[in-house]
């Protein structure tokens, strides 16, 4: 597999290099040189396969012979060890539930596949994963790499800005997992990660790698569950499929669009954000004008400068698709709460991120179409807000219950690179 740097097309790397480096020169994102396509017949045949076999086939189309098929399938089996069911919400709407993994969020798919790829590629070489999280990434990455040999993980998160349960899920592990609460917002955490990757000495000393949705292995893994969703739908809905994606860093939407470029029948996508609506405003008037990030109920989407957007634009350019074909919506907190109550009346307990996606979908779905919205996290991960909004008590799934009483092991740091650098050099 060959990939190129979106900021410098002359920088070309293999899959292994892209996974190991995370980012290219000047913080450029890597993008596949070849965009494979399956025929309609091949797609139909693939949709009959089981999740793991099909996923290995999809990933192999991108990765090629860099990783032998049987090793790839074995690694996929280890990564995707849980289902991605479509729950029926209304006669014309389903929710693709991506929260049945160990940390109850969609990031388990990408995080675990990336961990499998990195450990396969690195062999005996030590690696340090540095990533920023607004909640779910941290947990997924921590659990994916926990206890794996030769890997150290450092996770930055905005202090007091993620739910207490989210914090318990990944800040109680210890071992090879180091968590750092930063005095600042998610964008401040992202900025620290960028500074670290610009520090050549630190990069070399620690074998630095990023683990957020910019890593190509995570992005490729996420393509697979779109195929799994379509495989569960009745034949007659497949050609009228509209998918609404709750969007923060836009990795999930990028993966969905890549699935479409492979030949998966998706009529259109909707990018659903909260009031951090840089992309909806851009799609509306062509002006890219990020505002200060606002805290919302759907906190994993509190991102005003989405990292993956350049990949979306590149895919549209390469496929000669029109950006105006992409649906969009920005949903405020009041509407989010109202929508969660509506879903509850339909017999479906949801959380803020999925509610944003459902709202956008319901408002834009035409008669005769079938809508899917992505359920990116288990409602219990947002227990406090979900209980307050719905006025009912949620049971904690065992994954959360067993961590609820453990002590937090995080370091507290200011949003200051020198302090972070010192911590990382001292703990290598």
Swiss-Prot record:
Q: Which Gene3D superfamilies has this protein been placed in? A: 3.40.50.1100, Threonine synthase, N-terminal domain
> Got a GO cellular component term for this one?
cytosol
Its annotated pathway reads: Amino-acid biosynthesis; L-threonine biosynthesis; L-threonine from L-aspartate: step 5/5
User: Where are the N6-(pyridoxal phosphate)lysine modifications?
Assistant: 107
- Annotated InterPro entries: Ser/Thr_deHydtase_PyrdxlP-BS (IPR000634), Thr_synth_N (IPR029144), Thr_synth_N_sf (IPR037158), Thr_synthase-like (IPR004450), Threonine_Synthase (IPR051166), TrpB-like_PALP (IPR001926), TrpB-like_PALP_sf (IPR036052)
EC identifiers of the protein: 4.2.3.1
- Cysteine disulfide partners in this protein: none
On whether Lyase is a keyword of this UniProt record, the answer is yes
> PANTHER family this protein is in?
THREONINE SYNTHASE FAMILY MEMBER (PTHR42690), THREONINE SYNTHASE-LIKE 2 (PTHR42690:SF1)
Q: What is this protein called?
A: Threonine synthase
Protein source organism: Escherichia coli (strain K12)
Recall the taxonomic lineage recorded for the source organism. Answer: Bacteria, Pseudomonadati, Pseudomonadota, Gammaproteobacteria, Enterobacterales
């Amino acid at each position: 597999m060959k990939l190129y740097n979106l900021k410098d097309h002359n920088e070309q790397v293999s899959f292994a290099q892209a996974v190991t480096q995370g980012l290219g020169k000047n913080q450029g994102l890597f993008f596949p040189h070849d965009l494979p396509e399956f025929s309609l017949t091949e797609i139909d045949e693939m949709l009959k396969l089981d999740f793991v076999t099909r996923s290995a086939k999809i990933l192999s189309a991108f990765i090629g012979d860099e990783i032998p098929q049987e090793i790839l399938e074995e690694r996929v089996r280890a990564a995707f060890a849980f289902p991605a069911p479509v729950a029926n919400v209304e006669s014309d709407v389903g929710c693709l539930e991506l929260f049945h993994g160990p940390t109850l969020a969609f990031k388990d798919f990408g995080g675990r596949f990336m961990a499998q790829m990195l450990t396969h590629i690195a062999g005996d070489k030590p690696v340090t994963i540095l990533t920023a999280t607004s909640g779910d990434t941290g947990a997924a990455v921590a659990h994916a790499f926990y206890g794996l040999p030769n890997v150290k993980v450092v996770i930055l998160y905005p202090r007091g800005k993620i739910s207490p349960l989210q914090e318990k899920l990944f800040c109680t592990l210890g071992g090879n997992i180091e968590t750092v609460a930063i005095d600042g917002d998610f964008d401040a955490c992202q900025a620290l990660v960028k500074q670290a990757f610009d520090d050549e000495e630190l990069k070399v000393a620690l074998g630095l790698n990023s683990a957020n949705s910019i890593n190509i292995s995570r992005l490729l893994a996420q393509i697979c569950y779109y195929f799994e969703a379509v495989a569960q739908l009745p034949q007659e809905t497949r050609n009228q499929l509209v998918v609404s994606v709750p969007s923060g860093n836009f990795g999930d939407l990028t993966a969905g669009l890549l699935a479409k470029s492979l030949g998966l029948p998706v009529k259109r996508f909707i990018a659903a954000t909260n009031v951090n609506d840089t992309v909806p405003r851009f799609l509306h008037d062509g002006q890219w004008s990020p505002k200060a990030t606002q805290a919302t109920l759907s906190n994993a989407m509190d991102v005003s400068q989405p990292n993956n957007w350049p990949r979306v634009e590149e895919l549209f350019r390469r496929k000669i698709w029109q950006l105006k074909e992409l649906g969009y919506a920005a949903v405020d907190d009041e509407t989010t709460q109202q929508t969660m109550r509506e879903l509850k009346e339909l017999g479906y307990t949801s959380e803020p991120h999925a509610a944003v996606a459902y709202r956008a979908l319901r408002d834009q779905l035409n008669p005769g179409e079938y809508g899917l919205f992505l359920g990116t996290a288990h409602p219990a991960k947002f227990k406090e807000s979900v209980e307050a909004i719905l006025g009912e008590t949620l049971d904690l799934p065992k994954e959360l219950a067993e961590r609820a009483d453990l002590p937090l092991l995080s370091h507290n740091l200011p949003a200051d690179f020198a302090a972070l650098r010192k911590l990382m050099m001292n703990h290598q």
